[in-house]
């Protein structure tokens, strides 16, 4: 399931135009000048220096290129992708797991019922962050099985830029929380790099998550950007799913405090529904006995719910 949420839009005042036709706010050449771009070429070509350079400082005029900002009305986006979760799991799509916040979002927005993916983690994720067929971006297999053949090398080239890179170049704050199954196994080094195929190398300015298909929820293989971290040390009861949510909230709070008008793109990818299944005790207690009717009865209930919601075709059978 993939969910996008618009939080706010950025408003800017357009007051000037540079030679390329880009719109500029503020005094052109000053350090606080900003500009929008058309996005047809990324990164955009550097503007021509507009100052004056003479033999002495007093006869020279400094000039800064305008900082790129998104266009007026650019939305903030939260994209949530859960792992190994069937279409009929959340209540939003007829499941028996209560998902009141997702229900609220779906009621206020759009609910897609024809969203197809591959049957593997890495290929699906490569497609969603690039908007391209997974073979065309190197992910015919999962990252751990990377092979030295076109379509299977687990390398997303720069000419197939990820959405993090595209939005960053257009002035967004970009971040990735949770599972990263789009870094090939041969780039798992934690000190020497290379890091081109890590989230930070694909345009995501901040990364807090783990590499590979799965990780322990209590002692995860966890990174902040490209540095391994161990937040569970000295914190009994630590849980990655909770920590990840807290870190995302902190990130957005800090971003809003420092740049309240800057739109963000947050790629939020929890791994808690993938093995190893390690929910906190409070969730085990909450759902104890809820599925004692068995799979067949549960399937019939979900099927009826989905037909009632209209998220599956109403057949005569």
What are these regions (language model features)?
Residues 35-317:
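Formylglycine-dependent sulfatase
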Residues 1-5:
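Positively charged n-region of N-terminal signal peptides that target proteins for export
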Residues 6-16:
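Bacterial N-terminal signal peptides
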Residues 18-22:
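Boundary at the C-terminal end of the N-terminal hydrophobic targeting segment
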Residues 25-31, 50:
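N-terminal module-boundary/linker segments of secreted carbohydrate-active enzymes
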């Amino acid at each position: 399931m993939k969910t996008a949420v618009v939080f706010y839009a950025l408003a800017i005042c357009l007051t000037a135009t540079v030679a390329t036709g880009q719109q500029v706010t503020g005094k052109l050449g000053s350090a606080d000048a900003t500009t929008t771009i058309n996005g047809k070429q990324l990164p955009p070509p550097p503007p021509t220096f507009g100052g004056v350079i003479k033999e002495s400082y007093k006869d020279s005029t400094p000039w800064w290129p305008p900082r790129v900002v998104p266009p007026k009305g650019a939305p903030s986006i939260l994209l949530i992708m859960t792992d190994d979760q069937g279409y009929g799991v959340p209540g939003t799509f007829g499941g028996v797991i209560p998902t009141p916040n997702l229900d609220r979002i779906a009621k206020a927005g759009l609910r897609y019922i024809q969203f197809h993916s591959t049957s593997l983690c890495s290929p699906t994720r490569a497609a969603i962050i690039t908007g391209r067929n997974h073979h065309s971006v190197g992910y015919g297999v999962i990252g751990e099985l990377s092979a030295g053949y076109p379509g299977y090398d687990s390398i997303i080239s720069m000419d197939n830029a990820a959405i993090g890179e595209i939005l960053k170049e257009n002035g967004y704050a970009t971040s990735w929380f949770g599972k990263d199954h789009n870094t090939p196994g041969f780039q798992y080094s934690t000190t020497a790099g290379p890091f081109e195929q890590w989230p930070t190398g694909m345009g995501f300015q901040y990364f807090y998550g783990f590499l590979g298909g799965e990780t322990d929820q209590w002692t995860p293989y966890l990174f902040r950007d490209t540095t391994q971290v161990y937040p569970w040390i000295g914190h009994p009861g630590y849980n990655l799913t909770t920590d990840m949510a807290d870190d995302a909230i902190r990130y957005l709070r800090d971003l809003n405090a420092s740049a309240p008008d800057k739109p963000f793109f947050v790629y939020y990818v929890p791994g808690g529904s993938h093995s190893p299944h390690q929910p906190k005790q409070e969730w085990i207690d909450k759902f104890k006995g809820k599925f004692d009717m068995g799979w067949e009865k549960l399937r019939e209930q979900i099927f009826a719910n989905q037909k009632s919601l209209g998220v599956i075709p109403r057949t005569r059978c």
